[in-house]
């Protein structure tokens, strides 16, 4: 199994792809088993329960073998699983100093800054970084190695392209205080400058200068950020912390 260390260059799409290809694939399952069966806990099986009822955690092939061997002793069983041949585990979020809502999918090797907010249905891929006080809204996607600065809002359904497929050595970067509207798309390698605003539904194909507003398909500069724009796009601190 290939382990991607903290020293590996996650901006290299081919290194990430190699890691995914060579990683041991996992299909973890949870089995609820009713029957007169003795199950010994091993390195491959985690077992809970009493005489006639067991809850077993393990890889699919190991648990299925257990069920087949003991099929004459089992009255009922139920298998639950949520992935198949998964190459990258999900991030351990329990000690993050951030708000992670149910249904967010965050893969391993992701960095989440203090007081960040990850909403329901958001997807954050391997190697991405989310800065302090930034919000990734519902159903937004942050691709592999996407770099999100501090005090950024990525609107619902927005897509921040990753460095994988098509491969790109340069990640998307949203600098501090950027706002990306709902359903906007930021394509591979684009850098959005400090304080810029990307209008909802825009497709950004080129770098965005700081403190500008871009809109359209493809996105073009429509104005400079002014006091009225700042008022309309300001973040709500009560949603953070």
Curated annotation (Swiss-Prot):
UniProt EC number: 2.3.1.89
Pathway the protein acts in: Amino-acid biosynthesis; L-lysine biosynthesis via DAP pathway; LL-2,6-diaminopimelate from (S)-tetrahydrodipicolinate (acetylase route): step 1/3
Enumerate the UniProt keywords alphabetically. Answer: Acyltransferase, Amino-acid biosynthesis, Diaminopimelate biosynthesis, Lysine biosynthesis, Repeat, Transferase
InterPro entries tied to this protein: DapH, DapH_N, Hexapep, Hexapep_transf_CS, Trans_hexapeptide_repeat, Trimer_LpxA-like_sf
Q: Which reaction does it catalyse?
A: (S)-2,3,4,5-tetrahydrodipicolinate + acetyl-CoA + H2O = L-2-acetamido-6-oxoheptanedioate + CoA
- Organism superkingdom: Bacteria
List the protein's name: 2,3,4,5-tetrahydropyridine-2,6-dicarboxylate N-acetyltransferase
Q: Which family does it belong to?
A: Belongs to the transferase hexapeptide repeat family. DapH subfamily.
